[in-house]
């Protein structure tokens, strides 16, 4: 089992799919990485040599923000919005949808479980 960016990559899957187990790498970026390293898309992780795994690791470390660094960056961006006091920051602070979704009904994922209100029985 290869270990890239602190994540154990499954050995029986194709490299394109296996790279997507790393937070911050989707299908497009996985394809770009394999293109840079010149590894065929249909090759399995178990067929990779140690040198190829090392090349993939170097490309990811050099060019992409993944795993903990990406999570930290996103957290810092959200904290910055909240400190600014802009509309998006206020929505984050209040735990409401940020991107303009309706809140009269729905939005339960963001708001949490429904709170019981006295006198609202059927």
From Swiss-Prot:
<keyword id="KW-0687">Ribonucleoprotein</keyword>
<dbReference type="GO" id="GO:0005829">
    <property type="term" value="C:cytosol"/>
</dbReference>
<keyword id="KW-0820">tRNA-binding</keyword>
<dbReference type="InterPro" id="IPR018269">
    <property type="entry name" value="Ribosomal_uS13_CS"/>
</dbReference>
<keyword id="KW-0699">rRNA-binding</keyword>
<keyword id="KW-0689">Ribosomal protein</keyword>
<comment type="subunit">
    <text>Part of the 30S ribosomal subunit. Forms a loose heterodimer with protein S19. Forms two bridges to the 50S subunit in the 70S ribosome.</text>
</comment>
<dbReference type="InterPro" id="IPR001892">
    <property type="entry name" value="Ribosomal_uS13"/>
</dbReference>
<dbReference type="InterPro" id="IPR010979">
    <property type="entry name" value="Ribosomal_uS13-like_H2TH"/>
</dbReference>
<dbReference type="Pfam" id="PF00416">
    <property type="entry name" value="Ribosomal_S13"/>
</dbReference>
<protein>
    <recommendedName>
        <fullName>Small ribosomal subunit protein uS13</fullName>
    </recommendedName>
</protein>
<feature type="region of interest" description="Disordered">
    <location>
        <begin position="99"/>
        <end position="122"/>
    </location>
</feature>
<dbReference type="GO" id="GO:0000049">
    <property type="term" value="F:tRNA binding"/>
</dbReference>
<comment type="similarity">
    <text>Belongs to the universal ribosomal protein uS13 family.</text>
</comment>
<dbReference type="GO" id="GO:0015935">
    <property type="term" value="C:small ribosomal subunit"/>
</dbReference>
<keyword id="KW-0694">RNA-binding</keyword>
<comment type="function">
    <text>Located at the top of the head of the 30S subunit, it contacts several helices of the 16S rRNA. In the 70S ribosome it contacts the 23S rRNA (bridge B1a) and protein L5 of the 50S subunit (bridge B1b), connecting the 2 subunits; these bridges are implicated in subunit movement. Contacts the tRNAs in the A and P-sites.</text>
</comment>
<dbReference type="GO" id="GO:0006412">
    <property type="term" value="P:translation"/>
</dbReference>
<dbReference type="GO" id="GO:0003735">
    <property type="term" value="F:structural constituent of ribosome"/>
</dbReference>
<dbReference type="InterPro" id="IPR027437">
    <property type="entry name" value="Rbsml_uS13_C"/>
</dbReference>
<dbReference type="InterPro" id="IPR019980">
    <property type="entry name" value="Ribosomal_uS13_bac-type"/>
</dbReference>
<dbReference type="GO" id="GO:0019843">
    <property type="term" value="F:rRNA binding"/>
</dbReference>
